[in-house]
Structure formats: structure tokens, C-alpha cells
């Protein structure tokens, strides 16, 4: 497990983060409904050559969760920009997944953040997105938030399992589910789904173009959440190279094929 011993207060939200390794900076940004623990088998591989920063998005993992909180994509890029400023980063390497990918792109095009390289995979970046489950929860947040614990836990773990191509162990499922359980966590889980809004990617999608850093786009061939075709389209917009298909992998490449991500980041940082 990765340790997140630090807390930063950003726009009234407590954001938990950690840092390991030494060398130039690398920032890892997780997606939904996960936490920075998705990087536990990946970022330790870079500690001999990079100082790796990782954090839990606002409303996720160990970061603060509370009623009435804005945890949408509309705030996450602002949080990333604030963390860059606090950490004193100018052009770090960036590794981003899912909502983390959307956050990295929004921060680049809207907040002016710049990266030494961007490795982005299975990202929420192009419309349409949002599964039928997401659309249903958006319209019935209160009903889902009030479900009995055992029903919520069963639904949550079943949902998490669909992110991976290979069976995820009970231990790993429990790790990912833990922040979303209990009175605070259960409400927070449905809150973040209810706030999923395509307008936050629509407003930046028109700005997509070749970025001023090397961009590597990877995508799980078996991603049931965001189809591979979106990875192909995204690569054409922001990179000078085609998408890299990841075989035997679903949306959660960190669990299915972590070695592919390690290799991609090493290639990106070694080629500069």
C-alpha cells in the first residue's frame, strides 16, 4: 500500500498525498472510482530515477468527503494546479488514468500546466461517456445513497470487477471499496457519480491538439467502460503517435497489465 502522510487544504478541501523516490518529478493521477492505491505496483518501479507524487482526488480515497462537496471534473484540474504550485513543479512527467486523464488534459488546456511527458490511458476525454449505470445513479442518487450496507457493498464490488479484464482478488476489491463504505463513504460514492457531467470534457475537447511534450496514449483492448476506439481518436488529437493497444486488459490496466504501464513510462522518460 502507498502511504499518503501529507494533507493540503485546497479551496476548503483536505487533499491527501504522498511522495517517494528521488530525481526529477513524476505525478500520477488516478481515476474514478479508485484512489492513488491503483499505483501501488507501478510507482515504486521509478523511485531510483524519479520523485513520484501521488494524491487522492477531492472526494476520493483518503481525501476529504462531505455532504454538499463539489467533486466534479470541474474542480479536479484546479486542485492539480494548486498541488503543482505547492510542490514547486514546472514540467513534471505525468501518468494519468480515467478521470485523472481528464484532469491532466483540463489542467493543460485550461490552467496552463505543462508536462515533460504525458502517459495517458483509458481516459475520460471524449464524448460520449458514462455507462447506463452512471446515468441511472445520476437520476436516483438519494435512493442509492440510502441502500442497506450489504446491498451497496455487493453492488460496489460487482461494479469494480467490471473495470478489469482479469478476475480481481477479494483483497484488492476490498481495498478499492473501503473508502466508499460506511455512512460517509457510501454517500460519497454516489455523490461523485451524480456529479459526472459530460460538459466538463466537452468544454475542453474543442481545444485538443498536439501537445508540447511527448504524449503516449495506451488503451485496454478489453475496456468495457470506454471503448478502444476512443483511445484511437484521442491519440490522433493529442499525440504524434497512434494509440498503443494493451492486450488482455480492461479499463483498469493497473491491475490487468501493470508491467505495460511501467515500460511505457520508462520509455517516455528515457527518450528525452
Enumerate the predicted regions with their spans.
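Conserved serine/cysteine hydrolase catalytic core
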Residues: 185-236, 245
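Gly/Ala-rich beta-loop-alpha elbow adjacent to hydrolase catalytic centers
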Residues: 96, 100, 104
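A short loop-to-beta-strand scaffold at the N-terminal edge of the catalytic core in hydrolase folds
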Residues: 11-19
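Catalytic active-site module of serine/aspartate enzymes centered on a nucleophile-bearing elbow/loop
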Residues: 241-272
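Conserved HGGG/HGGXW glycine-rich cap/lid loop of the alpha/beta-hydrolase fold
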Residues: 19-62
